[in-house]
């Protein structure tokens, strides 16, 4: 039988190649690798294209950012009244559609220096979590903003007849970003107010704020829908926190209902402001907590506690302040007549601990000061017009730093004028400590003696009932060592006054006693209750402590 040769396998057959061995399926279908030189050239080309593209984007972005900055600056200033804004830079990110503004400065046109606000960075972006709820809104984040206002700027703001809601602030903020803002945050901001003394500013540092749901996209109508929280450091050592809800869309102005808490707030920085009410403040630490509501339809404050520690407070009366005192009294009378005060306030408890409270009269020929030191005062259930029921006050301390002082009072709703009961007792006060008062009203000096006074005062239905009874013990108004440099005539007056005190003495106890009747009718039922208290007590006190001294000195002068 004839044998035939097997045909040689071709390279396309799935058999072993005589040169390369068995051939794998699809081996010739793989792309051949480029030479190393060609691969380097392609990589370099891609890098060059990417760099060129980035350069083009950077150039376009830079020009667009400048165009955006100028456009936004113009739009903002077109909406503001009395203020102007400059922007240091602006950038719009194409990836998340966020807008960043840098180095924003706000100036008051009437008083441009210093700027009223500086904003290093403001970021506006889409609020993505609300987008999942099919609400297209935005958020704004202010990083390290600072607000700086001085007295001239504040006075200019108060003079402006344009309402705050019409000055364009909300429109200016909305001009920044095409979407409505629903979340606003402030991070590590600062607020500074400078009154007359730039060395004692009113300042809040480390200020943080968060306001959510501003557009009310989640809550029912008729409620305060926007959670709000703000906190900061007050005057370097104090701390304040406010937390509650707001309605930013209410008209004509936003409403708020919130709780607040103040801790260890130093009060001395308020001295420049308190001086406008004739009050001088030194020291003092404030703690307080409560809640308030302030809106177009309802306004009310409920303060649970106000506690002030180690305060020195003086009420100053001078010829220059007399007009202001009359004006404040008239304003208080108008408020008392108004059945709907601007904001009713109720204070559950007010406490003044270990403090000094005084009255300084610089309008007298011989200025004098009366004070109670180591004062502890507690007032409970204090409300506007005492409409929340009777308020009760209790006071203890040392009169003129020596005698013990006690006082209590009950204040009732004043529908027909001031309505209250008051009792005061001062025992064992040093008479020499009151020489400034004695010189002012009696033109005399006391070198020895103690003073006590007891008083009860009641006002109801415009009828005043009460008395002031002083007891002056071991009084001596003449001393040769003290009188060496005094005019002879003045020495004679003091000898006469000294003789008078001995005539009035109760011999067994070596005391001078008299009683001043306070019965009568209240002339002005619209007077402030505090004005009535101060006037009655001070007038009766002066008459009681100088029983007949004025008369005898005047008689001696005529002789």
Q: Which residues does each PLM region occupy?
A:
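N-terminal amphipathic/hydrophobic interface segments
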Residues: 37-109, 233, 239-240, 245, ...
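Outer-membrane beta-barrel and related beta-rich outer-membrane complex signature
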Residues: 152-154, 316-320, 478-486
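Transmembrane beta-barrel strands of outer-membrane/channel proteins
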Residues: 142, 260-262, 306-308, 424-426, ...
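Extended terminal
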Residues: 2-49, 251-253, 298-299, 338-348, ...
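Flexible beta-edge/linker motif
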Residues: 89-155, 169-194, 220-222, 227, ...
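Elongated, acidic membrane-bridging lipid-handling scaffolds
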Residues: 41, 162-269, 274, 332-433, ...
């Amino acid at each position: 039988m004839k044998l035939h040769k097997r045909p040689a396998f071709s390279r396309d057959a799935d058999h072993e190649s005589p040169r390369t061995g068995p051939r794998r399926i699809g081996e010739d279908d793989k792309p051949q690798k480029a030479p190393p030189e060609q691969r380097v050239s392609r990589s370099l080309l891609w890098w060059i294209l990417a760099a060129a593209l980035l350069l083009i984007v950077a150039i376009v972005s830079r020009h667009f950012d400048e165009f955006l900055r100028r456009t936004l600056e113009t739009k903002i200033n077109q909406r503001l009244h009395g203020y102007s804004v400059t922007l240091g830079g602006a950038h719009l990110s194409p990836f998340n559609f966020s807008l960043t503004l840098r180095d924003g400065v706000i100036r008051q046109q009437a008083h441009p220096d210093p700027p009223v606000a500086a904003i290093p960075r403001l970021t506006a972006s889409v609020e993505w979590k609300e987008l999942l709820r099919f609400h297209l809104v935005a958020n704004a984040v202010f990083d390290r903003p600072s607000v700086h206002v001085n007295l001239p700027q504040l006075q200019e703001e108060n003079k402006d007849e344009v309402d705050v809601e019409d000055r364009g602030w909300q429109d200016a903020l909305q001009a920044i970003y095409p979407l409505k803002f629903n979340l606003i945050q402030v991070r590590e901001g600062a607020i500074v107010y400078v009154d007359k003394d730039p060395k004692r500013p009113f300042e809040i540092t480390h200020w943080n704020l968060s306001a959510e749901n501003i557009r009310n996209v989640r809550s029912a109508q008729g409620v305060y829908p926007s959670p709000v929280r703000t906190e900061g450091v007050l005057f370097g050592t104090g701390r304040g926190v406010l937390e509650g809800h707001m309605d930013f869309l209410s008209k004509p102005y936003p409403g708020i209902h919130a709780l607040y808490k103040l801790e260890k707030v130093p009060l001395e920085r308020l001295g420049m402001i308190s001086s406008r009410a004739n009050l001088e403040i030194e020291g003092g630490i404030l703690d307080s907590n409560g809640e308030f509501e302030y809106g177009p339809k309802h306004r009310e404050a409920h303060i649970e506690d106000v506690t002030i520690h180690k305060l020195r407070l003086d009420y100053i009366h001078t010829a220059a302040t007399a007009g202001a005192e009359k004006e404040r009294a008239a304003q208080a009378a108008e408020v008392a007549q108004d059945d709907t005060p601007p904001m009713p306030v109720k204070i559950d408890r007010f406490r003044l601990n270990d403090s000094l409270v005084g009255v300084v009269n610089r309008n007298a020929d011989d200025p004098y000061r009366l004070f109670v030191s180591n004062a502890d005062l507690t007032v409970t259930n204090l409300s506007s017009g005492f409409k929340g029921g009777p308020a009760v006050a209790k006071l203890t301390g040392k009169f003129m730093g020596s005698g013990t002082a006690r006082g209590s009072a009950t204040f009732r709703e004043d529908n027909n004028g001031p309505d209250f009961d008051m009792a005061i007792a001062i025992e064992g006060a040093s008479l020499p400590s009151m020489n400034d008062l004695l010189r002012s009203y009696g033109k005399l000096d006391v070198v020895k003696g103690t003073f006590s006074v007891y008083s009860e005062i009641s006002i109801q239905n415009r009828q005043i009932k009460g008395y002031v009874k002083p007891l002056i013990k071991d009084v001596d108004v003449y001393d040769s060592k003290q009188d060496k440099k005094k005019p002879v005539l003045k020495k004679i007056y003091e000898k006469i006054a000294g003789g008078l005190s001995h005539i009035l003495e109760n011999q067994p106890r070596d005391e001078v006693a008299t009683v001043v009747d306070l019965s009568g009718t209240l002339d002005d039922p619209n007077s402030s209750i505090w004005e009535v208290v101060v006037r009655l007590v001070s007038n009766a006190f002066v008459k009681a402590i100088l029983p007949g001294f004025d008369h005898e000195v005047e008689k001696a002068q005529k002789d």
